[in-house]
């Protein structure tokens, strides 16, 4: 990762944000390290909470810092919407809604577990690759409501 072009005091802003959100900094760093290494069953982080709490701002900043890609569930009808996963170090799916959670639960379980997946690529043969670490943001927490409960 290219950290030469970053703000030297940027970590202080992150610390302030995490403290404001009542997140233990040491625990977060430990989880982030496992996430970046792509450890099985530890390769997906979901940031869920109330609207306008800074989830997306934090996630976009982190993905930009990591030179990652942003995926949009709105493009999920295309066979190629996951193609950026073949070329990035980390990826973000922002604002995961209930239909997106259903899709993830049905079709992306191997990706979330950090296992190899097959991705259709435009003008190329399908590519089998290990899914990069995924970061998801959502106003809906499936741990509280369940994926198929219809609540939100």
From Swiss-Prot:
SUPFAM superfamilies in UniProt: P-loop containing nucleoside triphosphate hydrolases
InterPro entries, per database record: Helicase_SF3_DNA-vir, P-loop_NTPase, PPV_DNA_helicase_E1_C
Subcellular location: Host nucleus
Chain residues that bind ATP: 49-56
Cellular component aspect of the GO annotation: host cell nucleus
Protein's UniProt keywords contain Isomerase: yes
The protein's enzyme class: isomerase
UniProt catalytic activity: Couples ATP hydrolysis with the unwinding of duplex DNA by translocating in the 3'-5' direction; ATP + H2O = ADP + phosphate + H(+)
Alphabetically ordered keywords of this record: ATP-binding, DNA replication, DNA-binding, Early protein, Helicase, Host nucleus, Hydrolase, Isomerase, Nucleotide-binding
Keyword Nucleotide-binding in annotation: yes
Location, primary (coarse class): host cell
EC identifiers of the protein: 5.6.2.4
Residue stretches making up the SF3 helicase domain: 23-152
Molecular function in Gene Ontology: ATP binding; ATP hydrolysis activity; DNA binding; DNA helicase activity
Function: ATP-dependent DNA 3'-5' helicase required for initiation of viral DNA replication. It forms a complex with the viral E2 protein. The E1-E2 complex binds to the replication origin which contains binding sites for both proteins. During the initial step, a dimer of E1 interacts with a dimer of protein E2 leading to a complex that binds the viral origin of replication with high specificity. Then, a second dimer of E1 displaces the E2 dimer in an ATP-dependent manner to form the E1 tetramer.
Family per similarity comment: Belongs to the papillomaviridae E1 protein family.
Protein name as annotated: Replication protein E1
Lineage: Viruses, Monodnaviria, Shotokuvirae, Cossaviricota, Papovaviricetes
